[in-house]
């Protein structure tokens, strides 16, 4: 049996609602996981938008495009609102006979015994668990109570997410333009909705946050490429960008997954997909261990999960850091080198396809 502790249930989904400002670009591999868990059909029935092309550039002459057709795929992935993902997964958990969801429960302390962990709740109750999975986000209580440290730093950028209505059909291409102050990205959504992502210095993002939607519309028109067309902003939110990596993912009877284990620069929208890769790997390793009659909550078994995921997450984090460092520099020789790099990437054929397959988890 599984017990899920959650401070609050996610809000129910209403088809007539405006989109969530928080959007995830769900890769083909993540869709595969959601299908295997039996939740994808319910999520798809709410609201998703397939994207088939991904483009990035700084100079128009140095333009890289990835196309689903190159990999003979029907789509590269789907743009899904976070509230849609959360509601779909929550409903599946609530309906599962082996799962108990405790809403309003909060962890007070955690004590590891020989074979079990005692979870002391703020409401006075104690739960005993053979395996504790910390899937409680970037500021993970489970990680902190387990005494697991993190390697972390703050990027010199913040990120603004803007829900917009488009005068033109948003299409099925997502794109990102690099600028000296930070990337500008476009994520197509359902109907005539889209999401814009604006990376910039924290002070600049705070300035944008203080604007009315009419003022923000003028700023978008001035700072996004002309191909965006006319858009009308309807909602916006912002957050600072922090890179974190837990020094370890596991202890006896404990495993960290997703943002509790690692956060990444959202440049390529890989954060949620890395978390889903963690879940996929942990499920597979636990099932294999049970099938072999091993103690599936033991440190040797859980270390297999850490070995499989930590290096992959580090590679993706480091790749995003290289992009961030390379495209945050406005020196002319650096700009020339990075644009030559983009031109080379566009012509790299097989290498380009391999990079795309890796990003999609294929």
Label each residue range with its predicted role:
Residues 46-145, 153-158:
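Conserved N-terminal helical subregion
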